[in-house]
Amino acid sequence: MQYNTSELCDFYADLIDVVDPIFCNYGGRSSFAGKVVTLKCFEHLGLINELVATYGTGKVLVIDGGGSTRRALIDLGIAQCAANNGWEGIVCYGSVRDVDALDGVDIGIQALGAIPVGASEQNIGETDMAINFAGVTLLPDDYIYADNTGIILSPEALEIASSMA
């Protein structure tokens, strides 16, 4: 399904929060949405590998990577594993790599930027916690909607009329 964050903002102005416009779109889907699963890690992707290997249908992995642009938290292997397990998308407050290859993976990805240097494989970080970045607080089980225009957040699932999709 395609989502139009501009129309969702107009219709649900009192319910949603808008994420600061600092993210770029990567991956094969230009829009995505789902229930938020949170992860906080800094330049370590071990827990990311574990999470994307789990069932992800209807979910979006939101990673607080501390805003690091020194090491990529998302690469082709992570994106493909997430897509294979049904994840709708990944929002990464950090960087990606393998940009050209990511475009061919059926998953939405938004991140701060790209760098060719990969992150450590260590399992350092925390899951299922409130995280703060880009002007919003994201809680596990919030709902997130993303497209080329931006990212919005809601405490509950938004009803999407066919005219908004």
UniProtKB/Swiss-Prot annotation:
One of its GO terms (molecular function) is enzyme binding. InterPro entries: RraA, RraA/RraA-like, RraA/RraA-like_sf, RraA_gpbac. It is found in: Cytoplasm. Keywords: Cytoplasm. Homotrimer. Binds to both RNA-binding sites in the C-terminal region of Rne and to RhlB. Globally modulates RNA abundance by binding to RNase E (Rne) and regulating its endonucleolytic activity. Can modulate Rne action in a substrate-dependent manner by altering the composition of the degradosome. Modulates RNA-binding and helicase activities of the degradosome. Belongs to the RraA family. This is Regulator of ribonuclease activity A. It comes from Colwellia psychrerythraea (strain 34H / ATCC BAA-681) (Vibrio psychroerythus).
